[in-house]
């Protein structure tokens, strides 16, 4: 268990009444789905992390996309950053996805609008590195703005909406100084405040878009807790703006422990005891959060036990599912989700 997830427990007593009521509503949801889907869905590595030179764990010898490039990080990074040019998920059916999640018994959906690699799964005006960009063959599809299409389908199906957003962005030029080498040459917020201010504005513009153009948003799920402190994106200002646009918004500023971590998010493990905080355990269906062909998956019975354990201890359970690069939910995942729903109804 990552210690930083629990190190900043604040409880709910110091929160305003409206937020305490919203958190009670959130706790009533019990079970949700988190979707990791992006250009990384093409390859057999995990999402985003293989771009980082120091993250050897993410580029194991059995990972084909790594060995095919002679374990050359520059070659790997270059090809990764061009994956969007072949991203054409024509099998994407947002209504089918939403109905499947309802059948599984889920009450809310958290979608990766942007992971650490910086690829945007919505029609942002801040960058061309997006699914609606002209270099992406899917940009002419009626559902090219997959975030909008999915959230609309979710709401029609009665599902609450959670926006996953990475505070880190390993593609944005304002996040790096001087070259885009993830995690090793981040713009210095003290020595280069002008560049960092551009990144802060970039981030705020993206959050404003997501809070303005995508209907009712219930939860803002902010990842990349390691950027706390030295990489100040003026969280108070950003959250105030988001809540002005989305009244009642719940914010999970993950693993930071500030006043904007409305609930804590233990990852890959369920706490042994009830926590003083509102919490949500997030665990993937298989070893990876994203789609990896033929990876071992938990059984439906195992997942139901995890859901019930989390709920019994006072927490929500967020199940990680990885859609395929073609826009479909894998058959094995679909079968397990349907069986989860059957087991929980009996």
Feature map (PLM): residue ranges:
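Mature catalytic domains of secreted/periplasmic carbohydrate-active enzymes
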Residues: 1-346
């Amino acid at each position: 268990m990552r210690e930083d997830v629990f190190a900043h427990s604040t409880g709910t007593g110091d929160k305003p009444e409206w937020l305490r009521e919203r958190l009670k509503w959130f706790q009533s949801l019990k079970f949700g789905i988190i979707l990791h889907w992006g250009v990384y869905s093409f390859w057999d590595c995990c999402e985003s992390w293989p771009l980082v030179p120091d993250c050897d764990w993410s580029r194991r010898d059995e990972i084909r996309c790594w060995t095919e490039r002679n374990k050359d990080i520059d070659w790997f990074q270059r090809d990764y950053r061009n994956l969007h040019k072949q991203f054409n998920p024509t099998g994407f059916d947002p209504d089918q996805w939403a109905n499947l999640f309802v059948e599984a018994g889920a009450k809310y959906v958290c979608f990766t609008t942007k992971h650490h690699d910086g690829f945007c799964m919505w029609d942002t005006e801040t960058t061309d590195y997006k699914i609606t960009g002209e270099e992406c063959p899917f940009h002419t599809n009626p559902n090219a703005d997959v975030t909008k299409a999915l959230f609309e389908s979710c709401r029609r199906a009665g599902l609450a909406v959670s926006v996953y957003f990475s505070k880190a962005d390993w593609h944005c030029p304002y996040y790096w100084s001087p070259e885009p080498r993830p995690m090793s040459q981040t713009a210095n917020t003290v020595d280069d405040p002008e560049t960092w201010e551009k990144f802060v504005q970039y981030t705020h513009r993206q959050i404003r878009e997501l809070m303005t153009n995508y209907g009712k948003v219930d939860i803002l799920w902010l990842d990349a807790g390691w950027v706390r402190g030295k990489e100040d994106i003026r969280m108070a200002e950003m959250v105030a703006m988001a809540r002005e646009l989305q009244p009642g918004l719940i914010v999970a500023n993950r693993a930071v422990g500030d006043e904007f971590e409305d609930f804590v998010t233990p990852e890959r493990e369920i706490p042994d005891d009830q926590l003083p905080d509102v919490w949500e355990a997030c665990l993937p269906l298989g070893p990876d959060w994203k789609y990896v062909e033929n990876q071992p998956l938990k059984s439906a019975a195992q997942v139901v036990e995890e859901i019930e354990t989390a709920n019994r201890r006072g927490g929500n359970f967020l199940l990680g599912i990885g859609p395929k690069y073609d826009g479909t939910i894998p058959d094995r995942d679909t079968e397990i989700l349907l069986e989860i729903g059957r087991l929980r109804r009996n």
